[in-house]
């Protein structure tokens, strides 16, 4: 009996353009599939077309936009964990986590969230 390998976790990163490239590189090198968004419209489109294992909102996103993005994710994907880099928006209900903005902090936080969901792992594990 052969086991079929599960695909690596699918992540959505929301950030301003310069921050986006760096985080994309970190996560792809760690073996994750990653989709990016730079605006609320792009977040809406992404969340309507795919189910993400984790949504990351970078610290480069202004606080009012973080709130709107968080509410959009909750509307389309109520169970998706949201990992906020930098300061957390306390008004985002549900699975919301916070991490620093270092490469190690982001990768460790994503892995910890996914380990709570046994069926999902990055490709490198």
PLM feature spans:
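Non-catalytic signal-transmission and effector/linker regions of two-component phosphorelay proteins
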Residues: 1-19, 67, 89-91, 102-125
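Short acidic active-site motifs
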Residues: 39-43, 65, 102
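Conserved phosphotransfer microenvironments
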Residues: 55-77, 93
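Acidic, metal-coordinating helix/loop segments flanking the phosphotransfer/catalytic sites
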Residues: 38-54
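A short, hydrophobic beta-strand element within the central beta-sheet of small alpha/beta folds
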Residues: 70-73, 79-91, 98
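Structural motif
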Residues: 13-17, 38, 57-61, 85-87, ...
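Two-component/phosphorelay signaling modules centered on CheY-like receiver
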Residues: 17-35
């Amino acid at each position: 009996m052969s086991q079929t390998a599960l695909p690596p976790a699918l992540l959505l990163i929301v950030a301003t353009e310069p921050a986006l490239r760096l985080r994309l590189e970190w996560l792809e090198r760690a073996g994750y599939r990653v989709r990016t968004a730079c605006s609320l419209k792009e977040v809406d489109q992404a969340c309507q077309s795919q189910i993400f294992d984790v949504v990351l909102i970078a610290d480069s996103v202004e606080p009012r936009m973080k709130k709107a993005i968080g509410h959009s994710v909750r509307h389309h994907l109520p169970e998706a964990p949201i990992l906020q880099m930098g300061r957390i928006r306390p008004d985002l209900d549900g699975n919301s986590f916070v991490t620093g903005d270092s490469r190690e902090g982001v990768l460790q936080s994503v892995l910890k969230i996914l380990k709570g969901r046994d069926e999902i792992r990055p490709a490198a594990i």
